[in-house]
């Protein structure tokens, strides 16, 4: 069966701890052209905040996923198409490689059919997720490519996520990740602030993830990133 993200060029990540731009709604977000909406954040995330976003998005046809930062904020809701659970391969703290996941699998009636792990490679040392997980961000492109191969070949991961949260990354690093896998999808996130950045990273990643932009600049800016990645993918 083909994975849903096989057809995704663009994912919009909503941080439940952040507000939308004044005057904009989740109805507007659903009309940006994004392929999926992912709800997740690193700091100050609660189930109540998660539910608020889920409730606001439940009536739209855009696929809706939760990316919980820890098992305590998992929300069971039929409006969700699934759960994307990060495994931080370069975490300094093993809790973020298997420890949190040990707790995850103890959730009663865990819906395995809708649960997928994402093999994160965190690359921005100043990002909250890097500090939170103690990630070794001093990796070169070859090392990132090797981590991507580990993710797919040794760990059976379907998604490799190169995360530069808060800053635009090195396209050569994303290209190396793509070169390290055969079938796994390569996601890229971080610093996508407009058409050019989306085009640049979309030339190497299968899917770009846009987050802060929707909270800081709004839906028109998000639409530009959708156009950028689609144009890049069309040229491949």
Swiss-Prot record:
Co-factor(s): Mg(2+)
A single cellular component GO annotation: cytoplasm
Binding site for Mg(2+): 15, 42
Pathway stated in the Swiss-Prot or TrEMBL entry: Membrane lipid metabolism; glycerophospholipid metabolism
Keyword presence, Chloroplast: no
Record EC number: 2.5.1.41
Alphabetized UniProt keyword annotations: Cytoplasm, Lipid biosynthesis, Lipid metabolism, Magnesium, Metal-binding, Phospholipid biosynthesis, Phospholipid metabolism, Transferase
Catalytic activity: sn-glycerol 1-phosphate + (2E,6E,10E)-geranylgeranyl diphosphate = sn-3-O-(geranylgeranyl)glycerol 1-phosphate + diphosphate
UniProt binding sites for sn-glycerol 1-phosphate: 13, 161-166, 191, 211-212
Location (main, coarse): cytoplasm
Entry's Gene Ontology molecular function annotations: magnesium ion binding; phosphoglycerol geranylgeranyltransferase activity
Subunit relationships: Monomer.
Biological role stated in the UniProt entry: Prenyltransferase that catalyzes the transfer of the geranylgeranyl moiety of geranylgeranyl diphosphate (GGPP) to the C3 hydroxyl of sn-glycerol-1-phosphate (G1P). This reaction is the first ether-bond-formation step in the biosynthesis of archaeal membrane lipids. Cannot use sn-glycerol-3-phosphate (G3P), glycerol or dihydroxyacetonephosphate (DHAP) as substrate.
Family membership noted in the UniProt record: Belongs to the GGGP/HepGP synthase family. Group I subfamily.
Name by which UniProt lists this protein: Geranylgeranylglyceryl phosphate synthase
């Amino acid at each position: 069966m083909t994975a849903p993200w096989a057809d995704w060029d663009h994912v919009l990540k909503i941080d439940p701890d952040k507000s939308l731009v004044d005057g904009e709604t989740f109805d507007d977000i659903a009309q940006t052209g994004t392929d999926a909406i992912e709800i997740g954040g690193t700091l100050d995330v609660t189930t109540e905040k998660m539910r608020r976003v889920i409730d606001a998005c439940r009536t739209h046809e855009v696929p809706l996923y939760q990316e919980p930062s820890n098992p305590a904020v998992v929300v069971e809701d039929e409006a969700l198409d699934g759960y994307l659970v990060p495994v931080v391969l370069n975490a300094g703290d093993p809790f973020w490689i298997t420890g949190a996941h040990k707790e995850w699998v103890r959730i009663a009636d865990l819906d395995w059919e809708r649960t997928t792990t994402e093999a994160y490679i965190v690359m921005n040392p100043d990002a909250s997720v890097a500090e939170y997980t103690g990630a070794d961000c001093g990796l070169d492109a070859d090392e990132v490519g090797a981590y991507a191969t580990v993710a797919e070949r040794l760990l059976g991961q379907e998604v490799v996520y190169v995360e530069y949260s808060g800053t635009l990354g090195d396209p050569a690093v994303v290209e190396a990740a793509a070169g390290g896998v055969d079938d796994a999808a390569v996601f890229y996130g971080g610093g996508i602030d407009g058409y050019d950045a989306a085009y640049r990273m979309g030339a190497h990643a299968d899917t770009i993830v846009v987050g802060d932009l929707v909270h800081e600049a709004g839906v028109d800016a998000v639409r530009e990133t959708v156009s950028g990645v689609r144009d890049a993918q069309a040229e491949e």
